[in-house]
């Protein structure tokens, strides 16, 4: 039987030399495992004289406890060193400049829609919405648009079938709102609309805001006053406005609204008019009792004028160099 003091001395040296938890566990197995040196010492007690067996057993157990205590102490030291090394590697140098956080910004078209909603909201107009896939009644028939009107052809409209299409304007929202309520009405309807056109000033999808007011004794002078105030508010300056006679199937009389630019030229910004009696009749409103006005504007066109953008398509190209200018 190997001398116990020698075994303890060797175990002590190997425990102190263990540089990792893995190496330390190997030492534990070597001395305390099923076939470890101290385990074999205990198994060899049966070969001793009974008079020596008790004392030898006590010495071996005492040595075993000493080795176990050294293993535990060394394990704690290695774990502490490992944690300190990990923390040191993850230390943040607070003197280094931080990562720059990019601030986002609203899209210019969104800014314009919100500006329009805010102005008309202060005048008591609610904001309504409706489906972008519309049927012929709400997109054409109820708006007094004749069967042979060019807008009903696939040159101008994206049809799914003869009765379903991508809406060409948000006027359908006006019809649905009036169908589901009773006058008086005062609301705007912003949203995406679709037309089969694509060039520098047109895209197949664009945004529109239409508005409507229906009540007793509504007149064109009220419409002119509201739109003049809106345009001055939108461009944040007093602008010269003119109303030109025009034709829209859903309004009578109808007008196009121009603003005078700084270079003296007139530029069309929206269309408007008094709601046609046939439109009121289509939703069960008596045109002898009620009258109303309606207006519609292209959001991208107003945005182009406000920010001096020349190509409408730039709003939809997702070029950050362009969009960052509007933060």
UniProtKB/Swiss-Prot annotation:
Keywords: Aminoacyl-tRNA synthetase, ATP-binding, Cytoplasm, Ligase, Magnesium, Metal-binding, Nucleotide-binding, Protein biosynthesis. Its EC number is 6.1.1.20. Mg(2+) binds at residue 252. It is an enzyme of class 6 (ligase). SUPFAM superfamilies: Class II aaRS and biotin synthetases (SSF55681), tRNA-binding arm (SSF46589). It is found in: Cytoplasm. InterPro entries: aa-tRNA-synth_II (IPR006195), aa-tRNA-synth_II/BPL/LPL (IPR045864), Phe-tRNA-synth_IIc_asu (IPR004529), Phe-tRNA_ligase_II_N (IPR004188), Phe_tRNA_ligase_alpha1_bac (IPR022911), Phenylalanyl-tRNA_Synthase (IPR002319), tRNA-bd_arm (IPR010978). GO terms for molecular function: ATP binding; magnesium ion binding; phenylalanine-tRNA ligase activity; tRNA binding. It comes from the Bacteria. Its main location: cytoplasm. Its cofactor is Mg(2+). It catalyses: tRNA(Phe) + L-phenylalanine + ATP = L-phenylalanyl-tRNA(Phe) + AMP + diphosphate + H(+). PANTHER family: PHENYLALANINE--TRNA LIGASE, MITOCHONDRIAL (PTHR11538:SF41), PHENYLALANYL-TRNA SYNTHETASE (PTHR11538). This is Phenylalanine--tRNA ligase alpha subunit. The lineage of its organism: Bacteria, Pseudomonadati, Pseudomonadota, Gammaproteobacteria, Vibrionales.
């Amino acid at each position: 039987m190997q001398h116990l003091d020698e075994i303890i001395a060797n175990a002590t040296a190997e425990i102190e030399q263990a540089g990792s938890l893995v190496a330390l566990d190997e030492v534990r197995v070597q001395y305390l495992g099923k076939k470890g040196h101290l385990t074999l010492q205990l198994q060899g007690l049966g070969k001793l004289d009974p008079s020596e067996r008790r004392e030898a057993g006590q010495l071996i157990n005492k040595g075993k406890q000493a080795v176990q205590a050294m293993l535990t102490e060394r394990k704690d030291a290695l774990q502490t060193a490992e944690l300190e090394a990990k923390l040191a590697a993850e230390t943040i140098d607070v003197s280094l400049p931080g990562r720059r956080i990019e601030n986002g910004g609203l899209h210019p078209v969104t800014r314009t829609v919100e500006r329009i909603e805010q102005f008309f909201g202060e005048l008591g107009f609610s904001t309504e919405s409706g489906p972008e896939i519309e049927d012929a009644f709400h997109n054409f028939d109820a708006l007094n648009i004749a069967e042979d009107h060019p807008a009903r052809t696939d040159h101008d409209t994206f049809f799914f079938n003869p009765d379903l299409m991508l809406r060409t304007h948000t006027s359908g929202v006006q019809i649905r709102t009036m169908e589901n309520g009773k006058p008086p009405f005062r609301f705007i309807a912003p949203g995406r609309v679709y037309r089969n056109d694509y060039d520098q000033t047109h895209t197949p999808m664009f945004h529109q805001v239409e508005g409507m007011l229906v009540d007793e004794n509504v007149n064109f002078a009220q419409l002119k006053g509201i739109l003049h105030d809106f345009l001055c508010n939108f461009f944040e300056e007093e602008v010269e406005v003119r109303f030109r006679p025009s034709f829209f199937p859903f309004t009578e009389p109808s007008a196009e609204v121009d603003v005078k630019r700084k270079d003296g030229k007139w530029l069309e910004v929206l269309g408007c008019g008094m709601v046609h009696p046939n439109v009121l009749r289509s939703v069960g409103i008596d045109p002898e009792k009620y009258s109303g006005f309606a207006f519609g504007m292209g959001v991208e066109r107003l945005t182009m004028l406000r920010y001096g953008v020349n190509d409408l398509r730039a709003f939809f190209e997702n070029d950050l160099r362009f969009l960052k200018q509007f933060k």
